Amino acid sequence: MALKAKKSLSAIFRFAMRNAAKTAEVEAKAVAGDSLISDTGPVSMSLIPDFLSSLKSPEDSSNIGQDFGEPALAGQVSSALDVKSIGYNLLRERNGEKVFPKNVLETLDLLSRKGCSSQKPKQASRGRMLTENYQNKQSEIMEKLAKGCVRKLGTETMFEVLTKMGKEAGEKEYNAMTKLCIQRARRSNDAEYALDQIGKAIEHLKEMRQLGFSIGEGAYGPFFKYLVDMEMVAEFQILKDFIKEACPESCGRLVYYEMLLWIQVNDEEKIHKLCNKVDDSGLSLSILQEYYLVALCEKDSKENFQKLLEIVDITTVSSPDALKSIFGYLGKSLLESVAMKLLWELRDCRKDGVETVSNLIFSYATCIPNSTVEDAIFKFNKLHEELDIVPSSTSYENLVSYLCGSNEVVTALDIVENMCEAGLVISANILHSLLQAIEQILEFNLVQRIYSIMSNKSVKPNSETFRKSINLCIRIKDFEGAYNMLGNLKNFNLAPNSSMYNSIMAGYFREKKVNSALKVLKEMKEADVKPDSVTFSYLINYCGEEATIAKYYKEMKQAGVEVNKHVYMSLVKAYASCGQFEKAKQVLMDLEVPAKDHNELKSVLISALASNGNITEALSIYEEMKKLRCPVEPKAILSLIENSDSNAELGTLVELTHELRDSKFWIDGFFKIIVFAVRNNRSSSILDLLEQTKNHLSKDDVGVEYWFEEVFKSIAETESSDVKVGLDLVSFMKEELELCPSRKCLDFLLHACVNAKDKQSALLVWEEYQCAELPYNVINYLRMYQVLVAAGDSKSAEAIVSKIPNDDKDVKCIIKESRIVFTPKLKKKKKKSKQKGLSLQAK
């Protein structure tokens, strides 16, 4: 921010905070008549945001007119939450006029409750319902929803919405609004906009105090950090005095922020003064020093940190988080001798010293810079040995989580197995970290090691552990292992549930083993496990016959199972797969379908029609939704691209990708177009498309690397392999994206050279392996041998064969067959000429 703007902000800030306790009448008078004198001169109040009175959003109902205020507000809420009603077009703009539906607020219960959007017991989505952190996820969703509303409606309008819906804004809402204002000010390069946001944050703090709310760190913390980063010392002191008066219990945290400030402005005198003196806050010296140490760690003030640490009694530090920060910073600073001295002190003086020290060793070992996972484990074990203690279960749990986060799952499994041998308790959290990491790295076969670990008596799994394990078994088609998991439940006094059986059933359906899937349904009933909506969704989706669809739907209704969104989706997909496109569309006409699910179901209908050959109807529904400004799910757009007619224009497909806001979905859609171009002989346009979008592609994106492999795979699979475009893609990846082609990319391209019998291109690809430092393997040698034989270069072909190990019978067989298949056939021209001569003589 420019110096002048910063000084203006300082003047405004002082004025606002010093008048925080004034009444609304005095504040209004000050706003009407006063002007501010800053270091840069007078600041006109007409140019400053109205900090000290209610701030109206440009889209507030008062700006539209009193008669139309209520529907306008309802429309804004509907738009923000993407709530749609059947028979209405929400927030349409025609000829500049906004049209809003009636009774939108009646259908919108979400913000007036804390968790549920219906008075009936809600059948939650599969993932949320079945996990332990359901409440946390709901909290995250509500926070995300609140942020979306604020972004689209504005802060003040959002508060007004809450009031109109019978929910007063509470501490959480004010905290969120204050934090959002500071975030906006921090991100903005516009001084005037930043001033406006700071003013709103001040107003929120004042309102919280006037309403009697406790002003916690969630509200003032981001504000203080912003002032620290802006090095606004005077403003910091004003805010500090305000918070100290409004919330006396916050004194401990205020000294932490004060230390951050003096470190930021590099005021060594103030830093030393704080480190050596008790202030008037009533806090003990040890507590103050604890906060100061954390601040010094955060700001990387190594010299002052060491000086303070020399006079601090580490055994008086009570906060586990503070100790974690201190020892993490010791590791970061490579101060092992200091760390060992403190660890010995903690080990010898505390009742829980051994466990505390073990946890701190983990913090130290994993924060050492430029160290590998192996280095961290070595240091972890070494320090435990030197201190003559055994790692605690908690430190092991932290270490396993750290390894899983680093994708070192095999190493994490080794450690857990060692824990079993040592008789340490294996908590459900450890198992969940392992299972999540296995799914993340796609090494599903590692779940078999989890199964052997769970046979140990020291393991404490729960139902969710078994559900996740069964799901991973199904991913590798290990149905026997999944059933073994089910049988093992009784050993832990756990009962099977529908989600476990559903995973097995879905696996059988995906493998087209319908009888086995139906057998699972029978086993559920025998185990007294009632089928739920997910069960019936699978049965309907995969039954494949119109009569069976009706049968399962009727059975579900008779069982009293709620028909939720997923069931309607299954009905749409099932009818479409049977070719009953009209019935698929009629599902959406059911009056019981909730209005909030209507657009999502339309998106499913688009996907179902497109994937079952009715691309024309799918596009028609898509265009209709766009005209009505209804959101279309990314998966539906991807399905339209993937199932497009071979004559579709590339420009039309590119326009579809413009609707994909999320970068992951956009990358999927864009590369599906590239694959489409390869498969439909449109290769000439590929490089142009890549050049136009190269700024949106990152070499660090795993999705980009994966999709380039898919493109090369398509090149290898086409009948007339376009090797040249493959070589051009390699050059583009290296030069424009600085991305080295993976082994899969080069393997597919070499295979394309075999199909095209293109020796020169194959030699270029062969060089790329060396550039990428990829060693040649048997498959590479065989492919190159086939190209050389096809080119008639027998000498080079034999040289390649000599490098292939001859102890594999299958490889020998492939070489023999390749020689027969790829050796060029000699044309018998002489024989043809003789036959021609004989025919002439006969004439």
UniProtKB/Swiss-Prot annotation:
Keywords: Mitochondrion, Repeat, Transit peptide. It comes from the Eukaryota. The keyword Transit peptide applies. One of its GO terms (cellular component) is mitochondrion. PPR repeats lie at residues 392-426, 427-461, 462-496, 497-531, 532-562, 564-594, 598-632. It is found in: Mitochondrion. The keyword Lyase does not apply. Its main location: mitochondrion. Belongs to the PPR family. P subfamily. This is Pentatricopeptide repeat-containing protein At4g21880, mitochondrial. It comes from Arabidopsis thaliana (Mouse-ear cress).
